[in-house]
Amino acid sequence: MIYGIGVDVTDLARIQAAQEKNSGFAVKILTPTELANYQQLDGRRAVEYLSGRFSAKESYSKAFGTGLGKVALQDVEILNNELGKPILTKHPFSGQAFVSISHSETLVFTEVILEKEGPERDDR
């Protein structure tokens, strides 16, 4: 059963400006493994990666029902599987979590769906 759905749209230029203004911005958003992957990228791909991870973590917090205040950015990790598909590899939810990340020229759109076993009950 679906526990929560979260969506987010983030402006790539806003994330790029934040990273340019504060070089520690990526460190605050990304887990060590995500950061290592990010540091292998440059230019537009780096901006897309950072923006996508930020937006997906925002979507996750919405699906979880808490917002970013209760779920730290470091509590959620999104890596790519062998086919390049983003997957949630670390998160506080005990059920299954699914993520989708899509980019346009100027925006990133993300969606997270959380599923759990058992009767429908909103215990947030």
From Swiss-Prot:
Compartments, as annotated in UniProt: Cytoplasm
Gene Ontology biological process terms from the UniProt entry: fatty acid biosynthetic process
Family matches, as InterPro entries: 4-PPantetheinyl_Trfase_dom, 4-PPantetheinyl_Trfase_dom_sf, ACPS, Ppantetheine-prot_Trfase_dom
E.C. numbers: 2.7.8.7
Gene Ontology terms, MF aspect: holo-[acyl-carrier-protein] synthase activity; magnesium ion binding
Catalysed reactions listed for this entry: apo-[ACP] + CoA = holo-[ACP] + adenosine 3',5'-bisphosphate + H(+)
Cofactor(s) this protein requires: Mg(2+)
Similarity field: Belongs to the P-Pant transferase superfamily. AcpS family.
Name of the protein this chain belongs to: Holo-[acyl-carrier-protein] synthase
